[in-house]
Amino acid sequence: MGNAATAKKGSEVESVKEFLAKAKEDFLKKWENPAPNNAGLEDFERKKTLGTGSFGRVMLVKHKATEQYYAMKILDKQKVVKLKQIEHTLNEKRILQAVNFPFLVRLEFSFKDNSNLYMVMEYVPGGEMFSHLRRIGRFSEPHARFYAAQIVLTFEYLHSLDLIYRDLKPENLLIDHQGYIQVTDFGFAKRVKGRTWTLCGTPEYLAPEIILSKGYNKAVDWWALGVLIYEMAAGYPPFFADQPIQIYEKIVSGKVRFPSHFSSDLKDLLRNLLQVDLTKRFGNLKNGVSDIKTHKWFATTDWIAIYQRKVEAPFIPKFRGSGDTSNFDDYEEEDIRVSITEKCGKEFCEF
């Protein structure tokens, strides 16, 4: 690298440092003083279910006053308690209302009633990366790299705030109208300065240290990035089997096989991300994220341009109008039932 290039790199590193310092200040203000609830169920017209989970659903809604479309996540308090997800749910809201990054879905409103908790997010009509990946089969390396770069920047941002994401997978990545990623579902995100021990995540994406019940840190997100890049470029994840236990055996074995079409740079990056030895895993070494950002596979990536959303996306999802749901699957519709008496008031008093 010439002197000019070295100087440019140096000033970029400095401006990233400044950016993250300011971002932390903004985050901490909101983290320490979370925004009060600012809406109610009656403010929204419910349109269609976009997804369902073990303790709730996500619906497309229309805000009556502004006619804007949003995605409303509805969590049944009693089910959250039964599934021991109180802490996770409180984390999700507290984190979402405090973060601000181009590739994170925005929380616009939140509130609760006798039965449910509600989080109203911007609606991303392009649907999940998962459905596009399954339809296309696999993404070319440049296509996969475009998405991977956004996740790298997002993790750099989150980790600088001491946040671990813990739930990276194609189902949680929405493709917006410009073809960029919106990370959704902060149900497992957590603010951790040292290590944490909770077993959570999705089997195919779990890092070995989580499976082995060791204390773990932010490095689990970099492992998951390796799994995601592999799955985007191959069309299937690096470790898969019928039963979770068989998946776990493969993950901890430290053996990965690559399709013959993977470039040597891609294989090299993945060997460093899917590295069982934490003292060798990229993202977890003394240079931190820069080992990943300066890796040969990312040589053509203009990190600033990606952050500024100036790079042309490889794929723009098709949709007609802001309330179109054609990129989401159909689900059975169910009424939202609200009890006349308060449920689990104590558990969720801080929501």
From Swiss-Prot:
ATP binds at L50, G51, T52, G53, S54, F55, G56, R57, V58, K73. The modification Phosphoserine is found at S11, S140, S322, S339. Its EC number is 2.7.11.11. Residues 299-351 form the AGC-kinase C-terminal domain. It is found in: Cytoplasm; Cell membrane; Membrane; Nucleus. A lipid is attached at G2 (N-myristoyl glycine). Asn-3 is deaminated to Asp in more than 25% of the proteins, giving rise to 2 major isoelectric variants, called CB and CA respectively (0.4 pH unit change). Deamidation proceeds via the so-called beta-aspartyl shift mechanism and yields either 'D-Asp-2' (major) or 'D-isoAsp-2' (minor), in addition to L-isomers. Deamidation occurs after the addition of myristate. The Asn-3 form reaches a significantly larger nuclear/cytoplasmic ratio than the 'Asp-2' form. GO terms for biological process: negative regulation of TORC1 signaling; protein phosphorylation; signal transduction. It comes from the Eukaryota. It catalyses: L-seryl-[protein] + ATP = O-phospho-L-seryl-[protein] + ADP + H(+); L-threonyl-[protein] + ATP = O-phospho-L-threonyl-[protein] + ADP + H(+). The active site is at D167. The modification Phosphothreonine is found at T198. A number of inactive tetrameric holoenzymes are produced by the combination of homo- or heterodimers of the different regulatory subunits associated with two catalytic subunits. cAMP causes the dissociation of the inactive holoenzyme into a dimer of regulatory subunits bound to four cAMP and two free monomeric catalytic subunits. Interacts with PRKAR1A and PRKAR2B. The cAMP-dependent protein kinase catalytic subunit binds PJA2. Interacts with GPKOW. This is cAMP-dependent protein kinase catalytic subunit beta. The lineage of its organism: Eukaryota, Metazoa, Chordata, Craniata, Vertebrata. The gene is PRKACB.
